[in-house]
Every structure is written in C-alpha cells, then in structure tokens.
Amino acid sequence: MNTPLSQVVIDDGRSYLERSSALYDVITIDPPPPVEAAGSSLLYSSEFYATVRQHLRAGGILQQWLPAGDSAVTSSVARALVESFPYVRAFNSLEGWGVHFLASMTPIPRLSATELAGKLPAPAARDLIEWGPGSTPQEQFEIVLSHELSVASLVDEDPNVPALQDDHPVNEYFILRRLSDPAYRQKVWRRLLGRSESL
C-alpha cells in the first residue's frame, strides 16, 4: 500500500463503486466469513457484478474469494458470475477454505507459473512466499494453478439453485435448507438429547 499508485478508501465497497466513476485493472473482493451473514449477499449478487463490470478497464479482472459453504451457495455465486461475465476461472483455496474466482469481460490469459512469478515485483514475491506452502514464487504459483476447478462443475453442484440476486440471497437462507434436510434435523435432535454430535 506504500506506493503513489495506491489510494486507500475506507468505505462500503459496493456503495463506493456505485458513487464512483473510477475504472480499475483489478477489483479484489475478500469478504470475511461467514458467507451466510446478513447482508453479505450484496457482495456476491448479479446486481453487484453488474456494478463491478462498469468499473473494470478493458482487460480488467475481478478476483473474489468465496468462503467454503454449502453446495447451494457455491452454485448460486458461480452461476451469478457466469451469467455476469463471459470469462470465469476458479481455484480451490490452498487450505480448502473456499474458492477463488477470476472473472473478466475478456479472455483471462493462461500464464505459466514461471510467467506469473516473473511479473512480481520483489516485495510482492517476498509476501507471496511468506504465506507458503511454496518456498519460491514459482512453486507457489504451481500449487495454485494445480488447484483449478471446473466452473461448470461448481454451477452444477446444485443445478436447481438460481443465480444469487439482491432480492434472492440464497446464502442467507441457509437455515431453511438445513432444517429441510432430514440428516441435519437428526443431528440437531441428537445434540438436544445429549448425544453430542457436532452440527
């Protein structure tokens, strides 16, 4: 952040974009879990992605992390992205904590680990290997690239769920899905009856 090219804005990201005319090469969204939190759908909805599209320069990329959740949430967000952007790639988190999406209005280059590592300034390379598990930037990128997922398979995890929308926040309806699942209800009853079983 210590560069004349960066400007830190403390604001609600969606509201800021809706009031701004600025264009960006990259928009990164890394919302804190839980993904089921009230209002969090506003950062995963088709309407939000329409706003993001208006603020990406030609060739710009949206990068978004989706914390691990149930299949309905994953499918709903993946569907919203696919319906909003013609080019979407997905990568499983190295720690298994969710999915990282890349989305763009133009094809996303498929660079090798060596090419990606070669684009990093030295401070960014040091930051990248600090997080591990790779010991070099190239090794880190090899690991990331080996975790690519099929976006179509993410959408198909729950093929009946619609794209997440502002007025249909699939992620926030988690309790209804869980309570309609007989196996989940059985776990609840076991826990209530003192037969400890985690939910």
Where are these regions (language model features)?
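Soluble small-group transferase modules, centered on the S-adenosyl donor enzyme superfamily
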Residues: M1-P4, D12-S21, S40, F85-L199
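The AdoMet/dcAdoMet-binding core of the Class I SAM-like
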Residues: M1-A78, V82-S84, A90
